[in-house]
């Protein structure tokens, strides 16, 4: 039951962080490109690498907390569904280049940031 509570609490926090962080990014740089979604997914990619690598190498993070942070917080923070919808809308609007850049940069940059998170955890 503790795991479910962690998932719920951290999930709510992750959703709120996504809402405010992506909104803040859009306020700064505009909506010509899905920058807000891009930003939260990059942050989430780094954190999943960091949290998973650190928690699997250390006893400081309980399995319940790890699940709460990854499934809960990062599940609420990151969003594949919004990424998919925004990309689809770009395609529908005839913005093939922007949609392609979104897909390629999102996947590649998120993989790099996951690796950076893993590397950071190994350094700690």
Swiss-Prot record:
| Keywords from the UniProt entry | Cell inner membrane, Cell membrane, Ion channel, Ion transport, Membrane, Metal-binding, Sodium, Transmembrane, Transmembrane helix, Transport
Membrane spanning segments where? 4-24, 32-52, 68-88, 96-116
Q: Name one GO biological process term.
A: cellular detoxification of fluoride
| Taxonomic source organism | Geotalea daltonii (strain DSM 22248 / JCM 15807 / FRC-32)
Q: Where does Na(+) bind?
A: 75, 78
Q: What is this protein called?
A: Fluoride-specific ion channel FluC
* UniProt cross-references to NCBIfam families, sorted A to Z: crcB
The job of this chain, per UniProt, is described as:
Fluoride-specific ion channel. Important for reducing fluoride concentration in the cell, thus reducing its toxicity.
Q: Which domain of life is it from?
A: Bacteria
Q: Which GO terms describe its molecular function?
A: fluoride channel activity; metal ion binding
From the Swiss-Prot or TrEMBL record, state where the protein is found: Cell inner membrane
Lineage at the top is: Bacteria, Pseudomonadati, Thermodesulfobacteriota, Desulfuromonadia, Geobacterales
Membrane-topology descriptor: Multi-pass membrane protein
Q: What catalytic reaction does the record list?
A: fluoride(in) = fluoride(out)
Q: Name the GO cellular-component terms.
A: plasma membrane
Family named by the database record = Belongs to the fluoride channel Fluc/FEX (TC 1.A.43) family.
Q: What is its main location?
A: membrane
Activity regulation as described: Na(+) is not transported, but it plays an essential structural role and its presence is essential for fluoride channel function.
PANTHER family associated with the record:
FLUORIDE EXPORT PROTEIN 1-RELATED
